[in-house]
């Protein structure tokens, strides 16, 4: 993101930070288990993960009263980031497919580095594209497919756009209205 703002050569590029609302809590277990199987994990391993997740329930005391119990990937559990990333791999593959089809152009943020179209670490996702409405539309379609499958919901207030130099305010306003 730093090179977007400082380098004069980088024009017409966007970094888009996606924040998923209560990302761990919202991850659909059925979706996660289907992914584990699709990625070649054994039934034994998948069942073990299922047991780890399904036997835990949380309940919170608030103002002396007990709130309803809830389930979900647990923040602080060492396994949760890995499971979340496995679930996020579907979004990453949707985006990679759009790059392969030529609908998105992977970008170079610096010389002598590979091109990138996305970065994912735990529940943080950053997408990169050229500043073209057609590419933004492709990214939006990927998110619109992924979110219902996974249970994720984009938190628009905490998500953000990081433009390179040379983009008009009119174009940035148009992006924000999408």
Locate the predicted segments by residue:
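Nucleotidyl polymerases of mobile genetic elements and RNA viruses
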Residues: 1-178
